[in-house]
């Protein structure tokens, strides 16, 4: 990472020159709008032309923490931070989020172009990060028809169940193998992330492992570990406030090193994904495949109104990667944080265990059809989503016209960031917001649902750009936590009375991976072999 004062001064000088010329040109073409009499949302003092770029390039890292600290200092739920010619609008209020994502959904239904999203979508070929337009509409139709429909959800039930079984098998095998020891320590971060990766690979490719997996076949091998770690690397850089996102012509400098990191991670993901796609395409073209078995097959056989393939090979590869990115993050992060909080609060863990024993019993494992009756377990998941979101912001929205939000002027082209952590930890919305308390979700709801319409929690967002995989994501996360709770008794590692639940400074993951002692609590015949 470059840390040279002369280089930074040189870059800022170039930036000033370029932005001066651009602003003069912009003034010639700017239309007069009545909304321009309104003020922008409150924000920090900014430099002429370059705005607050020096702040995000300097010591205010990570930028998302600086933004939330700034909003707290300004005592505002909506702010405006100018980065070169771009107005970045963070929001930490569910009321304002509803205005943006529901009332003015059409105004904010597109996405900005960023370095990270360009890489992960292979040049904007996918549904989640693609700006509004014909390509987005096409990909949305395909994903809605072949991935997120009720029929597809049921089609993938067995694959999801197989991986929930494998999770229990993986942990139990380690317990049996080490039965002579006084305790068995499980790397829960590894377990829950690989569960999510396994489900993604099983639904997409029909496989659990790229290679042989671990020695006993239930755990990940080096290939799966690299695959999932690379997916998480891409996720943490999707909107990382890279300089090139606001000054594209400086992208060649890669000042923060973001592009190198993302390109390497995407290369690793493609190294594993693309050969499977190429092989499957060949099987369909050679007539060896007759019936679809997974999401990849569904993409390949999708046809347009003329009977021609809807998706190109490159579009298939891009959408496969995006769906994997969307599958691995929320379930694993919520489960790791949820387990850590519940191990530290045995009374909460005990209530969840008692609910599962009452609804399911102890002679079989939890299955998805049990989930509607496991409200307390689902409340634990929802509380993990609220208090410990996987990312500080949703993917950015961009305003397609000048508009007014909460009485403030929002210029066309603004990047609007709905804050998951800001809303989930907002003391005006939640009593004792930093306390893990599943009961708060049971007082007014007879049925707990992660996708909250009031947007007091931002889990799957809302509107045209809301997450399309709500059913899959919810089922995966509920099953993951339920199986961990039902199958094993969990304690901190020896010598520790509590789990360290410190949050990483650079992101919202646990600062240290979760390790805990697992002891099987069911009869041996219940565990998959």
From Swiss-Prot:
It is a single-pass membrane protein. Pathway: Secondary metabolite biosynthesis; phenylglucosinolate biosynthesis. Its cofactor is heme. GO terms for biological process: secondary metabolite biosynthetic process. Belongs to the cytochrome P450 family. This is Phenylalanine N-monooxygenase. InterPro entries: Cyt_P450 (IPR001128), Cyt_P450_CS (IPR017972), Cyt_P450_E_grp-I (IPR002401), Cyt_P450_sf (IPR036396). Its EC number is 1.14.14.40. One of its GO terms (molecular function) is iron ion binding. It comes from Arabidopsis thaliana (Mouse-ear cress). It catalyses: L-phenylalanine + 2 reduced [NADPH--hemoprotein reductase] + 2 O2 = (E)-phenylacetaldehyde oxime + 2 oxidized [NADPH--hemoprotein reductase] + CO2 + 3 H2O + 2 H(+). Gene3D superfamilies: Cytochrome P450. Its main location: endoplasmic reticulum. GO terms for cellular component: endoplasmic reticulum membrane. It comes from the Eukaryota.
